[in-house]
Amino acid sequence: MKKPSKKSEIEFCTVCRFHHDQGSRHKYFPRHKSSLSSLLDRFRSKIADVRFFLKNPSVLRPQEQSQNRVWCVFCDEDIVELGSSFACSKAINHFASSDHLKNIKQFLSKNGPAMDCIDEFRISEADVAKWEKKCQSFGNEDASFEGSCGQLSGTSNDIHTKLAFETMDRIKKVPAHHINSYKSNDVMPLQYNTNEYQISLSEIPGVIHNGSYLNMDDSQFPLCDESGNGFGEHSIPCRSKDYSGNGNYCTQENYQVSQDKKQIDGSYNPPGVVGMTSISSSHSTDAGGNVHSGAPPPWLDANDGDFSSVQLNQSDVARFQAKVPGKNRKLNPNRVGAAWAERRKIEIEMEKSGHVTKSNIDPDWLPNFGRVWQSGTRKESRKEFEKEKRKLVKTESISTESEPVKIQPYISKRARRESGE
C-alpha cells in the first residue's frame, strides 16, 4: 500500500507574496515564474539607471538626496543617497559588494532561474574603479557646489537651473528706476473699503465713476510737474490714469488743492505734493446704486446703530423696541449686521403703525438673478418657465400659420425621370 506524501512546512514566498506548503517545487509553478520574471524586469530597469550614472557621474544636490533611492530585492534593503555627493554613489558601491553577490546567489537558488544571469544584477569592481577616477576629475567632493544658490563648479546637465540663474543675473543688472518708469495701466486692487473713501470728482470734465475707480481721459489733463511731485531724484511723469504713491490721482493745475485748505472733512494732502486731488473720507448718505457702482451694503452702512434716519423721538424708539419678540433678544448683539437688523425691525413696526420711513437703500443693490435665486421655490420657478415656454410655442405656431401653404400634386419618380430626360 502506497504511503501518502508528507506535506512540507508552510513558508512565505517573497516573489508571489503568499504562504504555501509546496516546498522547493513551488518555483516551477507558472504563477511563480510569471511573478519572478516581472520582478526581475523591474530590477533590471533600476540597475540600468544606476549604470547610466556609473558611466556619466554627476553631482547630487542636497535637496535631491532623499528622492534618489533604490530598493534591492535581493538584499531587502532600501538604499537612500543621504549624504552622497554624486548620484547613485551608495547604490553603485552596494551592487559591487560581496554581500550583494551572496544574496543574489541565495535568491536565484531558492526562486530560480539559472545562475548564468548573476552578472545582470551586479556591478563589477573594474567599473567601480573607473567611476571613482571620473569622480576624482571633478575635484574635491566638498567643493562641488559653488555659491549659496547651489550652482555647480563642474559640468552639469541641469539646463533648468542654468536658465534660472541667467535670468536672475539679467534682472539684477536692470536699474531700479528703469523698472519703476514702466508702470502698467492694469486694474489696481482696492486701496480702502468701499464705505470708507469715496472719490468726489463730479465737477471735473472727462472723469467717469466706475465702481471704486475713476476712468479719466489723457486729453483732459496734462502731465504733472516733475519738480514738485516729491518723488526724489528719479521722478516719474504721472498721467491722469496713474496712481501716485499715496493712492491719489494727478489732475489739472486748476483743480490743485493747497495745504491751507483744511475745511473739507477728511481731506488730506501730503507735504511737497503738487497737483493732487483731495479724496474725502466722508460718504454721501444720499448716494444710491448697487454693488457694481460702489454703493455700500445696508449691513455695512457707516450709520450702523444710528436711528437718525428714522424720524422718531426716544420714547417712540423705546416703544417700538419693546414690541420686538423675546426670542430675538437672545441673539448676539455684536453679530454682523446687528444694528441694521434692529433698525429694520423698528422700520417694520413703524410701517405697521402707519408711520412713513425714509430709506436711502437702493432695492437694486444686489443684482437680480431671477427666479429661484431671488425669491420663490423651485416648483414656482418651474411653473414660470413652463408658462413662458407655452407662450413661445404659441407665437411660433401663429407665425408659421400666417404663411400661405402651397399644395403641389404628387409626381412619381418615373414621371420625374421622364420629364428630366
UniProtKB/Swiss-Prot annotation:
Enumerate the UniProt keywords alphabetically.
Brassinosteroid signaling pathway, Metal-binding, Nucleus, Phosphoprotein, Repeat, Stress response, Zinc, Zinc-finger
One GO cellular component term: nucleus
* Biased segments, Basic and acidic residues type: 377-389
Molecular function (GO) terms for this protein are: zinc ion binding
Gene Ontology biological process terms in this record = brassinosteroid mediated signaling pathway; embryo development ending in seed dormancy; endosperm development
Q: Which tissues express it?
A: Also present in cotyledons, hypocotyls, stems, veins of sepals and stigmas, and actively dividing tissues such as shoot apical meristem, root tips and emerging true leaves. Weak expression in petals and anthers, and not detected in mature leaves. In seeds, expressed in both the endosperm and embryo.
Query: Matching InterPro entries, A to Z?
Result: CCDC84-like
Coiled coil start-end: none
For the motif Nuclear localization signal 2, what are the positions?
A: 377-384
> What domain of life is recorded for the organism?
Eukaryota
ZnF (C2H2-type) ranges: 11-32, 70-100
Q: What is known of its domains?
A: The C-terminus is essential for the function of the protein and it contains two conserved motifs (289-300) and (365-389) of unknown function present in orthologous proteins from various eukaryotes.
What is the protein's known function? Key regulator for endosperm and embryo nuclear divisions.
What is this protein called in UniProt?
A: TITAN-like protein
Which species is listed as the source? Arabidopsis thaliana
